[in-house]
Amino acid sequence: NLIQFSELIQCANKGKRATYYYMDYGCYCGKGGSGTPVDDLDRCCKTHDDCYGQAEKKGCFPFLTLYNFICFPGGPTCDRGTTCQRFVCDCDIQAAFCFARSPYNNKNYNINISKRCK
């Protein structure tokens, strides 16, 4: 669920960067994705896309799955749930922590995908 993913991102980065900055970044952060990731942050998004692909192969619906998590001072943790809920939550938490530790390059926000993502 994108709302929960947004909350996880804010928990992991302690509110340092608004979630919308990640929605149109590089070749993979946002809808779809193709080509070679432009940097570490974009690689986080590709890994997240791949994780959602694995969730779908397991019969889960990652964009619709609601899950439980707790935001601790050290970052988010998945709480109880079904196999699909735990899998999708783990995908989102891994991405949120990856975003938090990866540098953000303003030059890779809202790039020309047709030119840079081949």
Curated annotation (Swiss-Prot):
Keyword Nucleus: no
Pfam families membership: Phospholip_A2_1
Cofactor note: Binds 1 Ca(2+) ion.
Protein name (database record): Basic phospholipase A2 2
PANTHER family: PHOSPHOLIPASE A2, PHOSPHOLIPASE A2 FAMILY MEMBER
Disulfide bond annotation, renumbered to this chain: 11-71, 27-117, 29-45, 44-98, 51-91, 60-84, 78-89
Expressed in which tissues: Expressed by the venom gland.
GO CC field: extracellular region
Family, as annotated: Belongs to the phospholipase A2 family. Group I subfamily. D49 sub-subfamily.
Residues at the catalytic site: 48, 92
Organism lineage: Eukaryota, Metazoa, Chordata, Craniata, Vertebrata
